[in-house]
């Protein structure tokens, strides 16, 4: 969710963070259906680092540049196969679907806040070991705690 604090306007779409080099490098290139906003967290507030290119983009996008206090320094609808540099230095860039700027009624100087959407992590298979011999003698079932204890001691 993106919020224009100055105007009280809310964009209810999903928000993802591009806070690593690889995520910033990948951006929205080759994404067919842009139905979320991507917030780029840049290492420093500069004009050069905040420039974007639209090479290999499959559709146009709305772009908002923010300074370190999250105030809008520039915004526009970016067209495919072009390069854009903000008017002033920026620390954050928000890229999203066309129409996002209109919903938020963005103007220079507006304060923008975001709430990243939690992404569900994929399950990762973990190798575990079970006792070689399972015995039901003298018990009412399998003692699961014994196998857990064995797994913990193997890792320790």
Curated annotation (Swiss-Prot):
Domain of life the protein comes from: Archaea
Official protein name in the record: UPF0127 protein TON_0581
Native species: Thermococcus onnurineus (strain NA1)
Pfam families: DUF192
NCBIfam families documented for this protein: PRK03760.1
Family: Belongs to the UPF0127 family.
InterPro entries assigned: DUF192 (IPR003795), Saro_0823-like_sf (IPR038695), UPF0127 (IPR022906)
